[in-house]
Curated annotation (Swiss-Prot):
Its main location: cytoplasm. The keyword Cytoplasm applies. Keywords: Cytoplasm, Endosome, Membrane, Phosphoprotein, Protein transport, Transport. The keyword Cytoplasm applies. It is a peripheral membrane protein. It is found in: Cytoplasm; Endosome membrane; Early endosome. The modification Phosphoserine is found at residue 315. PANTHER family: VACUOLAR PROTEIN SORTING 26 RELATED (PTHR12233). Residues 306-327 are annotated as: Disordered. This is Vacuolar protein sorting-associated protein 26A.
Length: 327
């Protein structure tokens, strides 16, 4: 049985079946148009193997070809320049020499311990994808079919995970101290913290914590930043008083974020910020942003099997935003 669909050409159907398709886990990913796709899930270093099945739809016909091959491809595509895709992985297996097909055939393939250095990603301006590509080479028009796969990059617990503690404010008007329990969170983690009001001389009407995602594509003058508010957490609605302490508890699991991705193949980055927003009675907005790291925690079963993962934990420099006045 095939789990990856087929290509209906004029003569034959191209189909791929993974050797472990019955047991391999699948993962979901949102496409650029908001739809959810489900594909087989792989990790860095895992082999990819299976069969390419060519099924003739019209018995008695002949299919001349200049060779048949399968490729494992890792590719980055910038949506504003779709003609300029970049392949960071391209492995090729030749399945058949030039000749002709007169009946259905199957070909085994295996890509051993494939390096998959980045996480699959679809964002506002960029897509990083992995796929198997089967090509029947012909003189005029090749028969081609692509089968998407999803790759997750796993990480071990960071050795250092300091809390974030800062005192910010507006001179002689407002001073607050905020604290988050960690600076690095796994994707199912809970952000725990508190806000303490040291001085309150302006009337605050509303206060919230936002989780902001910034997708940065390109380099130099051609850099584009897409900002998206992933989550909002209302801290308070009403005026605080001096000495008041307000707890924070934000569950990341409900928002399905991606891991932090830094300078992926010199093409793009994905960074996350906690944005503390205050609104006064004159509807003026004050904010303070702090960058955090998000990482993908390995499942218990895989943690026992592996001790080394490619993702490293660094301390990115905070990136100030020019969208609103900062406290």
């Amino acid at each position: 049985m095939s789990f990856l669909g087929g290509f209906f050409g004029p003569i034959c159907e191209i189909d791929v079946a993974l050797s472990d398709g019955e047991t391999r886990k699948m993962a979901e990913m949102k496409t650029e148009d908001g739809k959810v796709e489900k594909h087989y899930l792989f990790y860095d270093g895992e082999s990819v193997s299976g069969k390419v099945n060519l099924a003739f739809k019209q018995p008695g016909k002949r299919l001349e070809h200049q060779g048949i091959r399968i490729e494992f491809v890792g590719q980055i595509e910038l949506f504003n320049d779709k003609s300029n895709t970049h392949e960071f992985v391209n492995l090729v297996k030749e399945l058949a020499l030039p000749g002709e097909l007169t009946q259905s055939r199957s070909y085994d393939f295996e890509f051993m311990q494939v390096e998959k250095p980045y996480e699959s990603y679809i964002g506002a301006n960029v897509r990083l994808r992995y796929f198997l590509k089967v090509t029947i080479v012909r003189r005029l028009t090749d028969l081609v079919k692509e089968y998407d796969l999803i790759v997750h990059q796993l990480a071990t617990y960071p050795e250092v995970n300091n809390s974030i503690k800062m005192e910010v404010g507006i001179e002689d008007c407002l001073h607050i101290e905020f604290e988050y329990n960690k600076s690095k969170y796994h994707l199912k983690d809970v952000i725990v913290g508190k806000i303490y009001f040291l001085l309150v001389r302006i009337k605050i009407q509303h206060m919230e914590l936002q989780l902001i995602k910034k997708e940065i594509t390109g380099i130099g003058p051609s850099t584009t930043t897409e900002t998206e508010t992933i989550a909002k957490y209302e801290i308070m609605d009403g005026a605080p008083v001096k000495g008041e302490s307000i707890p924070i508890r934000l569950f990341l699991a409900g928002y399905d974020p991606t891991p932090t991705m830094r300078d992926v193949n010199k093409k793009f980055s994905v960074r996350y910020f906690l944005n503390l927003v205050l609104v006064d009675e004159e509807d003026r907005r004050y904010f303070k942003q702090q960058e955090i790291i998000l990482w993908r925690k390995a499942p218990e079963k895989l943690r026992k099997q592996r001790t080394n993962f490619h993702q490293r934990f660094e301390s990115p420099e905070s990136q100030a935003s020019a969208e609103q006045p900062e406290m």
